[in-house]
Amino acid sequence: LFHGVGAVDSIVDVCSVAICLDDLGIEDIVVESLSEGHGTIHCAHGLTPIPVPAVVNLCQAGNIALTPAPVAGELVTPTGAAIVTALRTSEHLPARYRIEAVGYGAGKRPYEGCSGTLRCLLVHADA
């Protein structure tokens, strides 16, 4: 996971997620599925199909569902897949919940027909 050009970026991403989750006191992480694009991407090993092998292996190991998106390009990086695989505690939201906060993150790559953003909700289950 930590080889190649993005090694430092990946380490910073993983550490940043850990710090944020700790600061917010997050105990459960719900991820129903990850939306993934299609096509190929150039990487250190040449032209590689999307999802790239690391994402395939991580999602398979973590039983993470991938939902095809009508987008040409990589939406799920190996670092993102590793974070979800390591931290997800459930694939289902509570039957009833209240939204306490919303956070958005945006990538740098432009995609046609896709915002390239990630939305996270901080929720509390309703009794």
Predicted feature residues:
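Mobile "lid/hinge" segments at catalytic clefts and subdomain interfaces of large enzymes
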Residues: 26-126
